[in-house]
């Protein structure tokens, strides 16, 4: 484990002078010409190098006029406006759902008169009655004017489409205030109180970070239905921005990305469809920008969702082209033809769709394939020994703080804001840390022969991982279901002895009879015990006691978290307080086939 902690504490961000990427795992070496290059650029024999400025892959610095614009101000000066459903999660992070509406679908033209009217900005505010949310939509007239003036003088795409300034619209903007013409809806009050048992735990606490790959309706229909479901009268009209008459192909139109996000591409350089000698795939293009030196792409509240969704649909298009090349006879099928095929071919057609859709990460077909991989592992390796869950202490880890806010890593507010602003780096760190932990603990300490993991994101945006591990010489739990009583009893004893070797449910600060539980040390939350670097740990047992007190005790039940009403009585859904138990037991009942309960002499310890 010492190697694990040393690996994390040694992480530092390095920068490549050629591609201008900066990232913790970037391996940079000094070249004979005196510049520092990552291994990819050093081995790149292309002329010019694929990710260099000479190949139009450097968007350049952001001028002062564009540096401090709010999201609303940027949308007012954007000649292209991708429409996406973004919402704020608890504790400040953002999420999105559905598709980013890119121009081949519904939007048909570049804006040639800017700034946009406030009523044309694609923001739909959903708020509770009397809740003040317009503070998020600050607009400064002078800042908008200066930014637009700079773009007209310096952005090649703004000049090429002949954008002009609408002085009347500009004059209608507040000098420094909030937009008041934004479309707003208020959710209808619920007719009846929803009990906690009526809430889907999976949807409430965790959601996968992937969009639905095939929405059943158009984006316009989906948004209109959503507005109506929030209590709007059926006759309400959803006003949409004015559009032109020439469709725009998002994957081929030069300048599309630059005009959608002018603060990220100030001069128009490095646009995906811009001219370059050596082509770059859409996935590598977005990865490059998310690692760009100043971090502006990773920190932009909308661009990361735009990138994820665009890449996913790009891959879907490529998969569709491969399918058509391999099945040329189906190239001109209509929707009715497809319905007939589904009816006639049934499972055969479904298998075809699953096969081609499995390469699209996050789709049902993808997870169906992963499920089959897991089943194949179980068929080969037997039942897994351990099911584990690890959550991110992303506001506490000192190693992450040093990476994500190196200027002030000890400032709690700075750490929280940095995680909100740059979730991509925080998520990468969690993935990297888990991989190193699995290698150090499950493989090298427990000698696991194999493992399987799935990453998920909690409702507030922080990640966690569920996994399975196979350990050598583990008892065969299937023998507990044997018809032989002797085999069942011997297997019980074998499992109990094995579990007691690898599992500890003891709180060092509490006596076996639990009599001194009130004297146990309190949680260390200011500073949090997880803020403590491993290099500062001088007493392992004391540190373990503090970790248990802070992270492994269920000290508070509440209706918003764990209390559920069953049979007229409130109960903790995690079963706290636990019953005291002097030894590890295995119970086999009809309701719960096999339950192993470890020894318990601390009523609120996580066991």
Please tell me what each predicted stretch does:
Residues 114-129, 270, 375-409:
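Reverse-transcriptase-like RNA-dependent polymerase core
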Residues 1-275, 297-302, 306, 456, ...:
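Noncatalytic nucleic-acid binding interfaces
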Residues 12-22, 82-83, 105, 242-248, ...:
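Eukaryotic beta-rich interaction modules
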Residues 226-252, 260-262, 267, 273-384, ...:
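Long, contiguous juxta-domain segments that are non-catalytic but functionally important
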Residues 27-32, 51-54, 114-118, 276-280, ...:
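Short coil/turn segments at secondary-structure boundaries
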Residues 20, 90-93, 107, 269-271, ...:
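Short, flexible loop/turn elements at secondary-structure junctions
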Residues 398, 405-422, 429, 433, ...:
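Conserved His + Asp/Glu catalytic blocks
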């Amino acid at each position: 484990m010492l190697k694990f902690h040393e690996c994390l504490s040694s992480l530092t961000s390095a920068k490549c002078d050629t591609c201008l990427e900066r990232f913790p795992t970037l391996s940079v070496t000094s070249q004979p010409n005196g510049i520092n290059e990552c291994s990819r650029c050093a081995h790149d024999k292309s002329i010019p190098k694929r990710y260099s400025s000479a190949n139009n892959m450097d968007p350049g610095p952001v001028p002062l006029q564009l540096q401090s614009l709010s999201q609303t101000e940027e949308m007012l000066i954007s000649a292209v406006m991708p429409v996406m459903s973004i919402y704020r999660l608890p504790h400040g992070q953002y999420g999105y759902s559905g598709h980013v509406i890119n121009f081949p679908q519904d939007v048909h033209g570049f804006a040639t008169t800017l700034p946009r009217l406030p009523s044309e900005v694609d923001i739909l505010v959903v708020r509770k009655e009397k809740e003040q949310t317009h503070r998020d939509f600050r607009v400064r007239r002078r800042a908008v004017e200066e930014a637009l003036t700079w773009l007209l003088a310096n952005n090649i795409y703004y000049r090429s489409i002949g954008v002009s300034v609408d002085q009347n619209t500009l004059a209608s903007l507040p000098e420094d205030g909030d937009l008041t013409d934004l479309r707003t809806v208020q959710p209808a009050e619920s007719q009846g109180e929803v009990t906690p048992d009526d809430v889907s735990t999976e949807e409430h606490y965790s959601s996968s970070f992937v969009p639905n790959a095939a929405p059943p309706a158009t984006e316009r229909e989906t948004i209109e239905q959503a507005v109506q479901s929030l209590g709007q009268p059926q006759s309400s009209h959803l006003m949409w921005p004015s559009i032109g008459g020439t469709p725009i192909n998002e994957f081929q139109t030069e300048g599309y990305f630059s005009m959608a996000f002018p603060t990220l591409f100030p001069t128009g350089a490095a646009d995906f469809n811009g001219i370059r000698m050596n082509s770059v795939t859409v996935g590598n293009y977005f990865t490059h920008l998310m690692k760009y030196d100043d971090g502006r792409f990773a920190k932009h509240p909308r661009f990361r969702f735009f990138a994820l969704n665009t890449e996913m649909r790009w891959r879907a298009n490529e998969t569709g082209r491969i399918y058509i090349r391999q099945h040329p006879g189906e190239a001109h099928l209509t929707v009715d033809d497809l319905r007939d095929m589904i009816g006639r071919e049934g499972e055969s057609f479904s298998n075809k769709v699953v096969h081609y859709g499995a390469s699209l990460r996050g789709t049902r077909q993808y997870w169906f394939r992963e499920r089959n991989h897991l089943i194949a592992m179980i068929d080969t390796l037997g039942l897994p020994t351990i099911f584990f869950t690890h959550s991110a202490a992303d506001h506490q880890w000192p190693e992450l703080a040093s990476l994500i806010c190196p200027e002030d890593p000890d400032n709690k507010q700075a750490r929280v804001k940095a995680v909100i602003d740059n979730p991509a780096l925080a998520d990468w760190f969690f993935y990297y840390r888990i991989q190193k932990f699995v290698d150090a603990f499950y493989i090298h300490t427990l000698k696991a022969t194999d493992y399987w993991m799935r990453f998920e994101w909690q409702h507030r945006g922080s990640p966690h991982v569920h996994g399975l591990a196979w350990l050598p010489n583990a008892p065969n739990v299937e023998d507990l279901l044997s018809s032989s009583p002797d085999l069942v009893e011997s297997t019980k004893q074998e499992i109990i002895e094995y579990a007691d070797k690898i599992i500890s449910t003891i709180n060092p600060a509490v006596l076996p009879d639990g009599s001194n539980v009130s004297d146990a040390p309190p949680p260390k939350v200011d500073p949090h015990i997880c803020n403590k670097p491993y290099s500062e740990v001088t007493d392992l047992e004391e540190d373990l006691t503090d970790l248990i007190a802070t992270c492994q005790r269920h000290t508070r039940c509440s209706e918003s978290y764990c209390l559920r009403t069953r049979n007229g009585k409130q109960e903790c859904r995690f079963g706290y307080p636990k019953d005291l138990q002097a030894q590890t037991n295995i119970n086999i009942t009809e309701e719960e086939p096999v339950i192993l309960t470890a020894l318990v002499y601390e009523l609120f310890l996580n066991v």
